[in-house]
């Protein structure tokens, strides 16, 4: 099911659909998360699902997907994560269709966002802009 947050639609992650977007020149952000992992939930509440970050995704025309790894038996999510060189969550890959499919990783440690949400958002947004605009 799609989830809309501040006007941004997060589609359920599907590797084939993501790669199709990339082939068409689109940049795809993937939120690898799980409901049982507090860091994931904190990052979403104080950084990823904020109006500032949503505006930046919209401004940069980024497709957003969520890979909910709450069920660790979901081998498709696990295999894709391992294929891109990651083994743990949270993980925030962005596949840059605008840069021939280059894969970059946005920071998973967004500072202690519960204490300094502005610092976490700034760090995330700055890195997102750097990857797309450089």
Name each region found by the language model.
Residues 1-134:
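Proteins that catalyze or organize thiol-disulfide redox chemistry
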């Amino acid at each position: 099911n799609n989830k809309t947050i501040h006007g941004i639609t997060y589609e359920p992650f599907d590797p084939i659909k993501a790669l199709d977007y990339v082939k068409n020149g689109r940049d795809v952000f993937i939120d690898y998360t799980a409901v049982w992992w507090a860091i994931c939930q904190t990052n979403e509440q104080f950084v990823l699902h904020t109006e500032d970050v949503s505006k930046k995704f919209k401004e940069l025309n980024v497709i957003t997907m969520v890979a909910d790894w709450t069920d660790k038996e979901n081998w498709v999510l696990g295999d894709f994560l391992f294929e891109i060189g990651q083994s743990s969550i949270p993980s925030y890959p962005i596949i840059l269709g605008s840069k021939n499919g280059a894969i970059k990783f946005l920071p998973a440690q967004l500072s202690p966002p519960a204490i300094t949400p502005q610092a976490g958002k700034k760090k995330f947004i700055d890195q997102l802009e750097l990857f797309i605009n450089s």
